[in-house]
């Protein structure tokens, strides 16, 4: 890694999986939805090369050509497998309320959208020049529910309330209550509204209809669970 001249930007280029169709396009659509929900992510785009799309995203640990000190959740505390424990880390690092609300939004989005690969290396913290820690923008936000034996199943790496699947709206609300997150109901409802736009966004990205159907069905099932008054 080298220093860049003024005006240049550090990027990460994620090449499409040669064995799975539309990996870049799906990640881009999930990026669009996550940012529409209010989740912080670095600017990203699809980069076409020789007829294939690849996912290009700015690095969150580089600003104005300088490297920011960052550490994954795993490197800071190791073997964290509950969202409740990430909130504990946030309190220990004294991050502002905004970051904790951002973390709650990520948890809700991940559980509804099927981002099951939410392990402790997919959460990071940045120490800024003032010496204060902040949670990093989200990254690696994409559908990972198993549908062709290459991705994880529907169980999350990071559990909520000792459950690694979505059981009820109360499961999410309890996570909010125990961590003093305000307006949890409206946050959940806003994320649901955005995720209901998946099919149109996926068609705009020219994703194959059978794959759209698979992801859409998962999202609909999760929304049904959240809206079931008996759960």
Question: How would you describe each model-predicted region?
Answer:
Residues 1-120, 124-231:
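Anionic ligand-binding catalytic core segments
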